[in-house]
């Protein structure tokens, strides 16, 4: 043990515990007199553990940024569709001026600007937004044989 050349020796459990951290996850379930023990042991190097935590944080930040940007919506940009629709495509310009678009999300443009469509007389007929006149209401009731109740 003096000043001689270093001697090779076998790896002991002390060496393993020096270079590795031991994480033991112990999960206990009790289902009506039935005990299930799940012991899961993971051996990782300390350096690798830090790297894995940093990588996990990077992935979490990327996912958070993506979901914040997307907003979990079908259309991830500002909803300008109805502005374009009413300015360029709508069939009746006077109707568009009388009942401007209202709402957000899937209800944009399907109602007039008054909340819950109260006081607005518009409806969709054959894919066109039209004013609901007494004559049109009568025609709808006659065609379908039921009283027209606007929702």
From Swiss-Prot:
UniProt function note: One of the minor capsid proteins that constitute a network internal to the major capsid proteins and outside the lipid membrane. The minor capsid protein P12 does not serve a cross-linking function between neighboring capsomers, it may play a role in the viral capsid assembly.
Underlying gene: A139L
Keyword Disulfide bond assigned: yes
Organism in which the protein naturally occurs: Paramecium bursaria Chlorella virus 1 (PBCV-1)
Name of this chain's protein: Minor capsid protein P12
Keywords from the UniProt entry: Capsid protein, Disulfide bond, Late protein, Virion
UniProt lineage: Viruses, Varidnaviria, Bamfordvirae, Nucleocytoviricota, Megaviricetes
Region: Hydrophobic, residue numbers: 23-43, 46-66
Locations listed in the record: Virion
Keyword Disulfide bond: yes
Domain of life of the organism encoding this protein: Viruses
